[in-house]
Amino acid sequence: MEIIVDITKEIEGYEDVVPEKIESYIKEIIAKEYPPEDRPLYISLLLTDNETIHEINKNYRNKDSATDVISFAYNEDEENDGFYEVLGDIIISLEKVKEQSFDYGHSYDREFYYVLTHGILHLLGYDHIEEEDKEEMRKKEEEILEVYGYRR
């Protein structure tokens, strides 16, 4: 199964954020967790700042604050007859990830890959609205992070 990951980095600095490593991580998780498709899967990732994610959060989610990650899953009810099977878009604020890594006492890598995993799982249909779903999603996040050595 071909998986296409389109990564855009709109923020200066953060040289330790390596697109090739991120792309590989996304592809491995999607390949393990998503049923095989006959056509290529497409996912986009935007790495940005607090100001941009705040604006997106306000405009699309009616929340007037910056956040760490926003996922827009492609609507499964809509017909997708294009060349790609579009899973959706993930937007991550690298500034917010840095803040949270300090707040929670995690390494920057651990926090970044936690947030990225969270976004990927949303695209795969996980959510955390109901407590039972939240527990299932948290368990899956920790399982994935453990495989890659990102421990708390």
Specify the residue positions occupied by each region the protein language model found:
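Periplasmic solute-binding protein
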Residues: 121
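An acidic/histidine-cluster motif and surrounding catalytic segment
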Residues: 1-113, 124-152
